[in-house]
Structures are given as structure tokens and as C-alpha cells.
């Protein structure tokens, strides 16, 4: 048996990624030199650290259950071991001794009962339920009258999976599960003009899935392998694909990777150009509406505007003092960026300083989004607040405090001024590690609905194109569809892995979701 520090570090790194601690994972990866190890991450299955810990725990429990002569105790352990208990020798020895004493007591009781039975063989049998119960106590593991199991239990801090109402549950016939990725799928996005779904994964590939009705009944996939040049050859980068975005006419797909490169692909899967100027992983990238520029944010503390036609960097913006986490265009040449430095900068192509800087968050700013009119900027943070900013003032317009844990992402509804649904009020959705989604009336600065069916952190929210529905995805493996006016749950689907991303197609009749177990699912919401 051999265990190297590189192997341990890699499993810890993957655990941090899979658990949503992306910033911690990045920092740990740098300090432990993960990128310099020779471990092929695409071959390591999801949840590998948990799996090996469970096996180790089972080994310790088996060790407790074996006699000194090698024979196995006949019975179950008194109580399931926790992971912390298993690494404490005193606890293990105490459990082992208690187990032996309990078995000795059971054997003594059995012998006494046998003797008593022999002595009273001619007595009348007990007829009352209480007496019968006393004579036949439930064995460890059998159910008692009230349905509770006899004996002690391991404590589970997670709630049981919520029962899904049959009226809202999406049947398997309406769910298509797309398999092919060999690692967790961090992101997915529909083509804006056709039913092509793009996905990005930890297996160093993006994929384009054809879900159009005329695609021969099934779904075909194009594999977009992210390679780097080594010794004159293209070799897999073995780095996560963590961001992707279609241009507005659906002809090109941009991807961002932990290998530090952004790439542009055609819709038929051919690599059009590679954009290389970041010094480290890319956390976010976005096309502008016109389709001539791509914007990227990197761990190197910079943001870059790229010329989509030539692949050249038009301008690099080095204003953050820590990794840049998200970017969003206000118009075709002006954008906002946020960072772990707690600041938000608004920058413009051609300007060598930010045109505006917003300060007020007291922890990392995870996401930023301009409203459809480009007048208001929303931001969310690990400080548990959601803030609304205007270019007309320095202080935030609203400081919305209701979540009890970090807010991971936010989305504006496609309603109100400057949208195709101008007669509907604009809303803002926020998704948090407190397992809730909140819908906000931004004009009044109040929470309209708190959506509480999820049992684990919520990583993604997305509005339907008409703004009438909101999809949410959580690490509890569930995708929920909500009515935005009433706040009621209208559809629900339980997948096979924690949900990292949800997205709607352009018609608003399909929802895509990407998961931690490598699956991508498509939910057909047509009647």
C-alpha cells in the first residue's frame, strides 16, 4: 500500500470543488501544486474522497466486530461510528469493550430465558399484547409498534430528502438524461436560437448536445476537447471547463478553462480560436450583445476584452487586488467586474481607469448582473447580502439582508423596461447556501417570496423567457420550477447528482441541468 501527499492533496482538492468551495479549492490547488502532479483527474470518479473515507469507516467497524481469535461477533455494533469517533483510539476501544459486554449480557439472558422456558413449559402462554411484547422484545434493528427502530442511531445532520408531491413531479418520460461526461458538469447553456445544449465539465471537455426534434429521435453529442500544446503535440489539458457562453446569434460558443485559456468554437464543434493572455484559471466569460467582443475574468486579478474575430486581447484591466470572479456587460463596450477583494469595478474599453468603483460588501463578491435596461447593477456576496447599485451614486441603492448564509448567484427577470415583456414588473432572484431562493421587488427593496423546498445549498437559478417561471438547482439533486407570481412549486425533478446549473431554452419549454455525477438532464415541460 502506498499513499503520497500528492494523491491526498488531489482528493481534498476535488472534494472542495465538488462541495462548492471553488475559491478554497483554487487556493489549496495553488499552495499544494496540484497542477504539477501527474494525476489524471479525468480518471478519478466524483466523490472519491468520501468513498474512500466510507470504506475506512467500514474497516474500523469491522475491526470492532472481530474477536481476538479472529471469529466474528454475532450481532450489530451498539451504535454506528462517526468519522471523528473512528480516528479516536479511546472511543474505538470503549466501543469494542461495550460491544463485548453487551453480547455477553445477551448470551446470559438467552441462557436464563431458556432455563425459565424449560421450567414453565406447562404454564399458560401470555395473552396480553404487553406481556407478549415483554416476552418477545424486538431485536436490535427490528421495528417496534410505533415504527421506530430499536437501538441507537447514527446522527445525520442533513434533513431527509423532501417528499415530492406527485402532482408536480416530472415523470421519467419527460426527462432525458444525457451521459458522456466523465466528471462533474459545472455549467450548461442553451443555444439562443436552436435546441443545442452546451455543457462544461471537470473532464476537460465541453459538449454540445443536439436536442432538436429533427435530430433522429435521440440526442447526438459533439465533444469539444480542451488541449494544450506540449512538445509540438496537442495533449488534454486535464483542467476543468468552468464557464461557457453562446454569442447572441448562436453561431459561436466561448469556453473558459482552469488551464488559463478561453476558446471559441463553432456550433458544429470546431475550434475557431484560442485566447491566451490570462496567467491562471478563468472564472467567467461573456459575449457582448453585438458579438464582436468577449469578456473574461481570471484568477490573475485581471479582466480582458478580446476581439472575437482576431482572437487578440483588445485591453487588459488590472484593477482588482485579488481574483476576479464574475463579469457582466452593461453595453457593448462597458462592463462590471467583481472579486474576492470585495470591490466592484465598472470599466470601459479605451479607459485606463475604472469609470466607477462600488464598495460596501464585507466579503467576497460572488456574482454581478446588470438589469435588462443597464441602469441598475445587482451584486451578491459571502457577506450574506444582496446590493443594488446605480451609476448615479456611490452608495448602494438597496442593501437587501435576509439570507442567513452566503449568496452564490443572482438573476434578473426578463421583464419590465427594455425587455420583450415590458408590462410585467421586474424581479431579482437570489440563490443561497441557506438552501433558499428569494424573489425581490427591487423598486421597493422588499422580498416578495421565499422559496424553501430545497434541502441543500442552491447553486443556480434561471427565469423562463416570459418571466413567469423560475428554475432552481441545488446540491440536494433537485430541480424545482416555481411560479414567480404566486411563489408556488409547479414542477419538480430529482436527478442523480447535485445540481450545479439550470437554464431554459429560448422557447421556454425545456430546462437543462448539469450535475456533480457527470450527468446532464433535459426536462420537457410541454403538456
From Swiss-Prot:
It comes from the Eukaryota. Changing residue 364 to A: Affects recruitment to heterochromatin by MECP2. Gene3D superfamilies: 1.20.960.30, YVTN repeat-like/Quinoprotein amine dehydrogenase. SUPFAM superfamilies: WD40 repeat-like (SSF50978). Residues 127-164 are annotated as: Disordered. One of its GO terms (biological process) is fat cell differentiation. Belongs to the WD repeat EBI family. The F-box-like domain is related to the F-box domain, and apparently displays the same function as component of ubiquitin E3 ligase complexes. PANTHER family: F-BOX-LIKE_WD REPEAT-CONTAINING PROTEIN TBL1X, WD40 REPEAT PROTEIN. This is F-box-like/WD repeat-containing protein TBL1X. It comes from Mus musculus. The lineage of its organism: Eukaryota, Metazoa, Chordata, Craniata, Vertebrata.
